[in-house]
Amino acid sequence: VRRGFLTLPAFLTLSSRADRTSPTSRAKTILEQFFCVPLVPPPNVDIPELGDAGGDEGPVENVRQALEKHRASPDCASCHDVLDPIGLSLENFDPIGAYRTAYPNGDPVDATGVYEGAAFEDISGLVPALVEGARSGACPSEQLFSYALRRRPSGDDRTRLKEIAERWGGGTIADLVKQVVTSDAFRLRAKGKAR
């Protein structure tokens, strides 16, 4: 049932709350860290906690239902239409990453969704699309470059990053590590000559 890094308990726990999962936080982390998509809260929008999403309509039974009510607001829908399918695909994993098929109240977990027009049953069905999307972009190169050099890329690094990404070509992580550590930016920095 576990499918790669996204289903490891450490990732799932860090992107959850202590008392419940947070599909929004999980999806935000995936988009920011694997796709380099910066997400910021919308301005001038009062964002209620999911526990408050039931309002006058009665109690919310599970996270999916809470997000559906939350997404009913036009101010929230534009981001949540993107975030929720990704985050809800991980609902089979509780706040500490243990696999589950039902919520504490007994409702069955529904981890289905649609991502970029393709339906999936759970994270296992979504991972191939996410991996393909991440590999086709420059984000993995940029993230590893930042980690290896212990700094965010500057304007001067854009050409280097483009070259690294092109040479990597969406190959394996080992291939990407090799491209970064053999780059002039990394090798010269290690000798104290690069920024």
Task: Give names to the regions the model predicted.
Residues 1-148, 158-173, 178-195:
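Active-site substrate-binding loop specific to GH73 endo-beta-N-acetylglucosaminidase modules
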